[in-house]
Amino acid sequence: MSKLFEVLERLAATIETRKGGDPTSSYTAKLLNDPALAAKKLGEEAVETVIAAVAQGPDALASESADLLYHWLVLVAASDVSLDAVADKLAAREGTSGLAEKAARPS
């Protein structure tokens, strides 16, 4: 198993402990209390990740990817979507052509 998955599992658990926390003393609690803000931050991090990928090199991409994954985990938690629900969606798509899967989605 990749070290990434172990780190993400620990990070997700830490994020869960911040639910109900004081948003004035915890950035994570602040995002968890405001899913729209969490979504905005994820969007910003996605753009920064793309910029790093095309213009800043591997180290910047790794750093921005870490920020992106953190903010994604926070948004999922803030929206009360379990990681298992996301995993189920991914598992259901395994073995299916990306083009076929996308075409089968409801509009």
UniProtKB/Swiss-Prot annotation:
It is an enzyme of class 3 (hydrolase). The keyword Hydrolase applies. Its EC number is 3.6.1.31. GO terms for cellular component: cytoplasm. One of its GO terms (molecular function) is phosphoribosyl-ATP diphosphatase activity. The keyword Ribosomal protein does not apply. It holds the Pfam family PRA-PH. Keywords: Amino-acid biosynthesis, ATP-binding, Cytoplasm, Histidine biosynthesis, Hydrolase, Nucleotide-binding. It catalyses: 1-(5-phospho-beta-D-ribosyl)-ATP + H2O = 1-(5-phospho-beta-D-ribosyl)-5'-AMP + diphosphate + H(+). Coiled coil: none annotated. It comes from the Bacteria. Belongs to the PRA-PH family. This is Phosphoribosyl-ATP pyrophosphatase. The lineage of its organism: Bacteria, Pseudomonadati, Pseudomonadota, Alphaproteobacteria, Caulobacterales. The gene is hisE.
